[in-house]
Every structure is written in structure tokens, then in C-alpha cells.
Amino acid sequence: MSKVIGIDLGTTNSCVAVYEGGEAKIIPNKEGKNTTPSIVAFTDKGEVLVGDPAKRQAITNPNKTISSIKRIMGLMMSEENAKAAHDKVTYNIVDKDGMAAVDVAGKIYTPQEISAKILSKLKEDAEAYIGSSVTDAVITVPAYFNDAQRKATKDAGTIAGLNVLRIINEPTASALAYGLESKSDENVLVYDLGGGTFDVTVLEISDGTFEVLSTDGNAFLGGDDFDNKIVDYLNAEFKSSHGIDLKNDKMALQRLKDAAENAKKELSSSTETEINLPFITMTEAGPQHLVLKLTRAKFESMIEKLVEETIAHIKTAMKESGLDNDAIKEIIMVGGSTRVPLAQEMVSKFFGGKKLNKGVNPDEVVAAGAAIQGGVLRGDVKDVLLLDVTPLSLGIETLGGVATKIIEKGTTIPVKKSQIFSTAEDNQPAVSISVVQGEREFARDNKSLGLFELGNIAAAPRGVPQIEVTFDIDANGILTVSSTDKGTGKSQSITISGSSGLSEEEINKMVKDAELHKAEDSKRKELVELKNQADALIAQTEKSIGEMGDKIEADEKAKIEAAITELKDVLKDTNATKEKIEPKVKTLTEASHKMAEQMYKGEQGAQGGAADTSKKKSDDDVIDAEIE
């Protein structure tokens, strides 16, 4: 079995690792960094940029730079979180067959496709590091991701050309990375505050077994929300003094977002920061600038309610775990947003001033844990068992719109459970089974995952037919539902895949599209490398002419200069193809080689002549020199 990579597909940043040599190793990207911004950009030239290159041009290309795509992964456009995301980003979120997607210059991309581009880059970086092709991967998701979001994440991996062996929860992966070397039995709490999601998980680690006791969280709460509070504040202050709403200008909004993120980071170590955005907009009076000081105290007052919400989730998780606060030995802080001092203070305070465990790298520990799980699946890591849980209850809609739970929140997975239901009317020929996920009492208030029908039920009075509904959750937390008419033996089953918004046919098409673009990208890369080679050749040849120009025959020099001019002219053409450039490069290369040969022969001749003269003079015993 080939190497298995572990991937933390984050809202703000992503990270990839591999288990080798008895440990999880973080794989640097080609830019030399351990994390890659989860940003994809589409340029006017048709290029697709991923990571740092995409982030660098975000301000000048806000409409076609996609960030925080994880926040709309697996969301229906009708959901409030999709609508909220639409108002916070610089790109256009649209409805595609009921699901949230993005519109880039008239072309619609699903969140799975955008995420696949990020995963593809991580895959390429891993292959460059490992030195061989990589296919198998373990990908992490927030513990509070629902079935639709999990399935969408797995689909993204498939589109990127990955065989996703396992989807595991981020806090569980973190605990795995922390506790692999642990020799003692202990209860740990993982507080995972990332860019767009928050999870808290309580685990018991005992003799290589990692058992999740409880989990809680919010898949739409994270550092992005901290940033947005600063953006709202900056915009309100500027609007108050200048009467201009900067959110109406996509470029200005992107500058606000970048400034907010930087200010948040600075306030983790400083008590005050200055936000200086010159030329943020233009009015009839001329260019306008935004200059504001922001104190940590002011920032903390903005985000206090958000951090308090995370504490409420800790309370829920602790209650469901059945443990007292004193039973928690370690509190592991995971996710870049845990660097915010207020979050650290409030978590420590909740546990009576307990010291937090900051021994793990909050940006890398999730990927490391995923890599360890990859090692477990590959057989490299022995005697480790993960016992995770389903984060939300699963059930079906029954008479009166009630959500009847079949698998309760916090049930250890994998799991399979069944219940018997019946018809609501006499001689009912079919039943529609609506699958829902959530904790609300009525189906309409929960997340709808899918709908399927069991037909040809034998005619009988209401309540007589026995219909067995079975829920089967695999180790990835992905659900399959089946129903069987006990009287006729007829059955129907579905994997809740439609909940991600993509059919198998659509996924296969996207895989092919990704392969197609890979070929295009490869061609584009070859063209860029050829242009770089051409520029270097021109520079070197011109340098040689400058240094040895008087030693080159006039005709040969003219040919070389003509070849340089022709190559420069073709490079000026932005539409020049490889086929146009290559012959010009070849011509100049051959000419420069001839020049080098002439120069070499000239030097050899000069040295030979000098040697002859020296010999002759030596023979005559004559010294030709001037002496002062």
C-alpha cells in the first residue's frame, strides 16, 4: 500500500502531512510554508492560482478570488448560513440546483470543485515531498459537520483524484496527534477554534484507545467572524466620517478584510494596532484614506459574545460526557483562532484557572493526526483504536411532521440501528421517507438530508404494515438509509449522497474536468518555463556580446543581434504559443553557441601565439620590456 497523506482542509488555511519514520511529518508546500491558504483565484489570463499566489492578488481581483469556501460546503441556498455568507464575501454566491455555489465570470463552480483545487495542490506538494504518486488520503472535517457537509468533503477529494480512505473529525485527529505517545489514562478536552468552524470534544485516552465521550460546536463560528466584527467596525467608522459605505466596493471590502485579519493577529501579542489604508476610495474631493487605532480591549468587546458561545458549547459537551470539570487532565487548544487571548482566558477561567496545553502547533496538529490515522489504516501504527461519535441525531419525519430519532447524538460510530414504522392511512400503497439530522422536535426545523420512497405496499388497514427503517453510519460518519416492507420483503435503500448536491455522474464529470485542466495547467507551466528560459538566454547573450563584442566577427554579431530582436518581439506577444517561441529560442541558442566557439578559438589562438613568441624570445635570450 502506498503512502497515505493526512489533510486538514481548513476554512482559512490547509495543511498536509504523512506518517513516516515512526512520526507524522508536516509537508511544506512549494513556497516553503507548512500551511497553504485555502484560497483559489481565477485570473483574466485564464490561470487558476491556489494558496499564497491567490492570496497575494486578492485585493486587485476580489470578484474572482474565492476564500472560506468551506463555509458553504454542502449548504442549500435556502439555509440562513448560506445567505449570511453571501453578505460577507467579495465573490458571488449563487443557487445551483438548490445548493450554494459560486459564480466566477459567468461560470458556476460548486464548493466541492473549489475545494478540489486546494486538495490538488496539497496532493502535488505531497508527491513532490514523498517522491512518488499519492492517491490515498485521510481528510478531516469539523466534528459538527452534518452528513451533507461530510459527503461534500469526500466528493471534493474524489474530484481532486484522491481515494478518501477515511473522513475523521478535527478534534479527534488533534487528540490522536497529542495522545499517541501518552502512557497514562486521561480525559482530555479539545477546544478547536478555526477560521470558520468551532468544535469542542471530550475524549478518554486509554491504552491506545481514543474514545469520544461527547462533542458539540457550531460549524459556522470561527476566526472569520472575528474578522467580520472588525470589518463592520471599520466600515461603520468610515461611513460615519465620510458618508461612504465601503462594502459596496468589492476591492475596498477585500482591503478591509485583509486589514482586519492582520489587526486580529497583531492584537494577539500587542495591546494596540494601527490600521492604515491609504486611497481606500475616491470622492469628488479626491482620494480618501482610512486610518484608525484599534485596542485589544475594543476588539475583545466586539468578539466577547462569540467567545461566550464557545463556552456554552463546552458546558454542553461536559454535561453530555458525564464528567466533572476536575476530571479533565488536559485542555488542548487547536486552530489558529485559539491564539486570541480572550479565548484562552475564558476557557481557562471556565476550568477554574487551569493551565491550557499549548504544546501542539494549532495550525498543524490536525493534519498530523490525520496522517497518524493514515498510518493506522496502512498498518504502520499498531494498537490504536478511534471510537468517534455522530455529532447530531439522525431520524425520519413521521406523522404530524415530528422528527423521530433513530440514532441519537453522541452514538459511537460505525453504527447500525433499525425501527419499525407503519402506514398513516388505510390501504396506503407507498411511504415517503424523509431523512433529517438535528436535535429539534419537528422535521422542518432540522437539516433535511434526503427523501426516498418505498412503494408497492400490500393493501391493509393503517397501522398494520410493518416497515423497518435502518440507519447505517460508516466510519466516515456518512449515512446509508434502507427501508423494508416486512410483509412483502420489498426493500429500498439510499446512501445520503444527494445531500451534498452532487450526483455520482456529476462527480465523475468534475473528476474528468479536473484532469483536463491539469493538462492545460501543465501546458501553461511549460510555456512559462520556456519564456523564462528565453529571457535568461537573451540576458546571457547580450552580456557576452557586451564583454566580447570586439572579438566577434561583424557578420556573426549581426546575426546574433537579429536573433535577439526576433525572440524579444515574439515574447512581447502575450498570445505567443510554445510553437512560435521554440524556433526563435533555437535560432538564438545556435547563434550564441557559434559565438562561444569563436571566442574560444580566438582565446586559444591568442594563447598559442603568445606561447610561440615566448619560445622565440627565449631562444634569442631577448627580454622585451620597459624598466623604469
From Swiss-Prot:
It comes from the Bacteria. Induction: By stress conditions e.g. heat shock. It holds the Pfam family HSP70. Keywords: ATP-binding, Chaperone, Nucleotide-binding, Phosphoprotein, Stress response. The modification Phosphothreonine is found at T197. Signal peptide: none annotated. InterPro entries: ATPase_NBD, Chaperone_DnaK, Heat_shock_70_CS, HSP70_C_sf, HSP70_peptide-bd_sf, Hsp_70_fam. PROSITE patterns: HSP70_1 (PS00297), HSP70_2 (PS00329). Residues 597-628 are annotated as: Disordered. GO terms for molecular function: ATP binding; ATP-dependent protein folding chaperone; unfolded protein binding. PANTHER family: HEAT SHOCK PROTEIN 70KDA. Belongs to the heat shock protein 70 family. Acts as a chaperone. This is Chaperone protein DnaK.
